[in-house]
Amino acid sequence: MPKMKTHRGAAKRFKVLKSGKVKRSRAYKSHLLTHKNAKRKRRLRKATYLVGADAKNIKRLLPYS
């Protein structure tokens, strides 16, 4: 059986932790930031986690993580 391929787009965006949780960064933090307030930008710096079916789908794309 051939090796499974890692989905490179998913590999760049998600990280599977030891606990099995899938970590991701938040959107809306790359440009057009001047009108966003400091509190909002500070919240966007923090990572968040996928749950349920979303996490399962991403894990399927990352077979070696």
From Swiss-Prot:
GO CC aspect terms: cytosolic large ribosomal subunit
Pfam family, one: Ribosomal_L35p
GO molecular function (one): structural constituent of ribosome
Cleaved signal peptide residues: none
Coiled coil stretches, renumbered: none
This protein's record includes keyword Plastid: no
The entry's keywords: Ribonucleoprotein, Ribosomal protein
Gene3D superfamilies: 4.10.410.60
An individual GO BP term: translation
Keyword Ribonucleoprotein attached: yes
HAMAP family xrefs: Ribosomal_bL35
Recorded family membership: Belongs to the bacterial ribosomal protein bL35 family.
Name of the protein in question: Large ribosomal subunit protein bL35
Record organism: Thermoanaerobacter pseudethanolicus (strain ATCC 33223 / 39E) (Clostridium thermohydrosulfuricum)
